[in-house]
Amino acid sequence: MDVNEVEENFFAPGDAKLHGKMCNALSVIYCKIMSIFPSLEAARPRSKSGIQALCSLHVVLEKVKNILRHCTESSKLYLAITGDSVVLKFEKAKSSLTDSLRRVEDIVQQSIGSQLLEILMELENTEFSLDPAEKEIGDQIIGLLQQGGNFESSSDNNELEVFHQAATRLGITSSRAALTERRCLKKLIERARMEDDKRKESIVAYLLHLMRKYSKLFRSEIWDDNDSQGSSSLPCSPTIQGSIDDAHGRAFDRQLSKLSSFNFRSCNNNRRSSQMSVPPEELRCPISLQLMYDPVIIASGQTYERICIEKWFSDGHNTCPKTHQQLSHLCLTPNYCVKALISSWCEQNGVQVPDGPPESLDLNYWRLALSVSESTDTRSAKRVGSCKLKDVKVVPLEESGTIKEEACESEYQEDQVTLVERCTELLTTLTDVDTLRKKCRVVEQIRVLLKDDEEARILMGENGCVEALLQFLGSALNENNASAQKVGAMALFNLAVDNNRNKELMLASGIIPLLEEMLCNPHSHGSVTAIYLNLSCLEEAKPVIGSSLAVPFMVNLLWTETEVQCKVDALHSLFHLSTYPPNIPCLLSADLVNALQSLTISDEQRWTEKSLAVLLNLVLNEAGKDEMVSAPSLVSNLCTILDTGEPNEQEQAVSLLLILCNHSEICSEMVLQEGVIPSLVSISVNGTQRGRERAQKLLTLFRELRQRDQTHLTEPQHTEVTSPEDGFSVASAAVTETKPQCKSASRKKMGRAFSFLWKSKSFSVYQC
């Protein structure tokens, strides 16, 4: 595999959100190793140490992949403050790769060993270090974290200025970028909760607090959104696996040692050593996590440090931080009993009694605040969900303004508005507005929302979006509005991406007849084909689409000059449909075999490989075999691929020819007349594993046919025996049946073909 191809498929310059220089250097080495990895596997070490070396390299490569993915999918703010730990992970990956490559170098051939040596030299010369500008940004954000822990923090204007400067330097300069950053932070919080890492959760919660607090800075920005109609791959959550280990944790601790004012503490700042007893949870404030100086009771019955709970209330909370219970009042009652218990515990354990309230607020505060906010949003979501889209107040759309402007205005509302409320608002607006023009603007907003938000697809599907969009598409067809048809089709496409439930709803709601109506409009072919591709991935949809007008339509696209993406989608859709055996007669009757003939020898690999994959599905049907044998140039094209194709294509072609030649001796004669023996011998030595096996089987088949043909030719054709009694002759070997005579004639031709091919001294019978 080519290095550039591996790199293009996995990591491209600019993918990394931060630490791009380190990522690019490591990804180049990763791609070089991956390009020769098949050769390493092909070495097939027999010794235990060799197998362990290869397995070790595979594990290290997975860790490298996870590190690069972490830098491309994680939060920019989080990457900035954990720069030191990221550098440590890169250094550890470098060390592990070096060790693994040295072990593998001993078990491979010299030619591959020289390539490994070059990679090792490049790896050893690679230095990983933080970019000074990125380190400065990280220090700025850490400074904000320190200020966020103070009860008497600096003014919001100063905080705003510092955060805006840091965010701008990180590229968070638009509403779109701010939304992406908030989503990344939420995913980090979810992972921290799964790992029960309260420190990490608290720090990320405060970063999310800052993002929410200052997202209004970006709300006036206009972003550009280009939809990819044929893309079904969506952003996935960051995967931080074994590469984040104990060493990373220690580096993270060192990085945050500067934040000692808000690290988790078991007692006050004057604690003696790490060996002293940990205070009972009942004596520590749930917010500051320290021994309480002035414990007070709130309406829920929980006890807190006075200064901490007062800040909680002053920030607008009217719930208990620990139980999330709505408080009937915000009065504070001193808890003298707990204060006495604290004094007693300190005396017994030799710990100094707190002599004042904490000077700073632990970041645990922000974790609790986020938890309360999420529980409130959940209750709001349940209330909105239970109302079933009724009695919801919606802001009507204005008559003027472009789709892009309105999408920007509604896409980024206040952070307090939940996703459920947004989905509900859009669906209700779509139902309430009366003109197709207004509906079109709403559907465009829905399309943008669904494009890269899996949760939105789920919520929209559960709340009637499928039916609403199909109704809109029907109206667009009735009014012959091409642009509305395209917008509606792409909204349905986005709704169906990676969501089988929504696909099932579309089928049940009658999407196929609407798509068949759209086939009359050439401008809609691209969006219609994209939906067919999306639906064809669903098993339940294959028989429905296979028996519709979609099959002749998509087969016709393979013949005609149309958009490349449209033709690609059609070919992939037909491949999915061909995996369902009852569809094969319909595909054959649509003349699919002839349509694929020219694509099998296309200059572009994507056409050849997928066309051969479709043919491999069709050849499993008896009628499919007959159709292929009778196709004018298909067998010739397959033989050409044996000589000029890529290894995977050669494997597919030889598999097809093996099945066809086993099915028909006529096909065997056609294949041999193409002079394929040298190509088959080459594949049997240098092809893929399956390609080698099938090339050998095909050569064996030809050898058996040749031997049978030679035996037949050497047998006496006619033997006369004279009877002594009556003196007449009897033809003991006479053959009178028509069918065997035809076979004999065919074998004579085969014999001539074989005798011609085996005259070459370069290829003996034993080579076949």
Swiss-Prot record:
Domain U-box positions: 278-352
Enzyme Commission number: 2.3.2.27
Class of the enzyme per the UniProt entry, highest EC level: transferase
Family annotation (InterPro entries): ARM-like, ARM-type_fold, Armadillo, RING-Ubox_PUB, Ubox_domain, Znf_RING/FYVE/PHD
Keyword Transferase: yes
Keywords: Repeat, Transferase, Ubl conjugation pathway
ARM repeats: 454-497, 500-540, 542-579, 581-620, 623-662
Catalytic activity, reaction form: S-ubiquitinyl-[E2 ubiquitin-conjugating enzyme]-L-cysteine + [acceptor protein]-L-lysine = [E2 ubiquitin-conjugating enzyme]-L-cysteine + N(6)-ubiquitinyl-[acceptor protein]-L-lysine
Functional note: Functions as an E3 ubiquitin ligase.
Quaternary context: Binds to SD129.
Protein name in UniProt: U-box domain-containing protein 45
